[in-house]
UniProtKB/Swiss-Prot annotation:
Record family assignment: Belongs to the thiamine-phosphate synthase family.
Residues involved in 2-[(2R,5Z)-2-carboxy-4-methylthiazol-5(2H)-ylidene]ethyl phosphate binding: 148-150, 179
Highest rank taxon of the organism: Bacteria
Protein name listed in UniProt: Thiamine-phosphate synthase
Binding site for Mg(2+): 84, 103
Amino acid sequence: MHQRLATLAAARLYLCTDARRERGDLAEFADAALAGGVDVIQLRDKGSPGEQRFGPLEARDELAACEILADAARRHGALFAVNDRADIARAAGADVLHLGQGDLPLEVARAFVGPDVLLGLSSHDRDQMAAAAAGPADYFCVGPCWPTPTKPGRAAPGLALVRAAAELHTGKPWFAIGGIDAQRLPEVLDAGARRVVVVRAITAADDPAAAARRLSSALAAAR
């Protein structure tokens, strides 16, 4: 737990990726992204091209994808995260379980995954953000900064919520999320974030390692 917390505290670039079933290159992609500077890599297949083509990811296949990402994360000294599924997180030996506002309560998740797995929580308004900062989550995310196809129909609170998070001056790690890419990153940094979650900025890149490197370098320069 202590090593995971130390890795989380130093983390700046958090990547959510699907299982890349339509491409069949998850292992190669993960290695490239992590080599480029990704600090946390999370499997999130909801709404992915693979889901649209092949249907929802079955638990057995999700666990297999988790094993690929967990192995890559270990080799690169990064953290591996599972989205929503406490059972998959436990079975896969994940470092992190990330939960949304409608997912398992943190206390229930903690009892299920044990004391050593880090817990993250999404927040979408000031009240949720303040509760996440004060509560038992090990880190929290704020956003979306911009509308994103990853969360269709969800209003984006924008950079105002990022500014509010920065004004909390909390010692707990937090990440800005939602529509962030290399072009928008300077605005996010100006709003006070020093950690970000990205999806398409790396998953859609022709060169995932270079895309990750560009983001990681910009985040490092802003410390």
